[in-house]
UniProtKB/Swiss-Prot annotation:
Gene3D superfamilies: 6.10.250.3130, S15/NS1, RNA-binding. Part of the 30S ribosomal subunit. Forms a bridge to the 50S subunit in the 70S ribosome, contacting the 23S rRNA. One of its GO terms (molecular function) is structural constituent of ribosome. The gene is rpsO. One of the primary rRNA binding proteins, it binds directly to 16S rRNA where it helps nucleate assembly of the platform of the 30S subunit by binding and bridging several RNA helices of the 16S rRNA. Forms an intersubunit bridge (bridge B4) with the 23S rRNA of the 50S subunit in the ribosome. It comes from the Bacteria. The keyword Ribosomal protein applies. This is Small ribosomal subunit protein uS15. Belongs to the universal ribosomal protein uS15 family. Pfam families: Ribosomal_S15.
Length: 89
């Protein structure tokens, strides 16, 4: 299921650099992480939904590239983001 506007606003308020921030890597990674978590739960129930599995893999790849970018720009921002999101890295 897609993220609701309220969920997006809450996530962007927590991880964005300011209230209307949608473009910073931190905000994008946080939104992708929520979508990945939702898709993971969906796939636990619907094991044979291969179209959604491919979408999940694409989202994970996009998040990985954004995290790599943040790590290249500022390692401390990267470490803080990974810790706040609870990612294994």
């Amino acid at each position: 299921m897609a993220l609701t506007a309220e969920q997006k606003k809450e996530i962007l308020g927590t991880y964005g650099l300011h209230d209307t921030d949608t473009g910073s890597p931190e905000a994008q990674v946080a939104l992708l992480t929520k979508r990945i978590a939702d898709l993971t739960e969906h796939l636990k129930v619907h094991k044979h939904d291969h179209h959604s599995r491919r979408g999940l893999l694409l989202l994970v790849g996009r998040r990985r590239r954004l995290l790599k970018y943040v790590a290249q720009i500022d390692v401390e921002r990267y470490r803080s983001l990974v810790e706040r999101l609870g990612l294994r890295r």
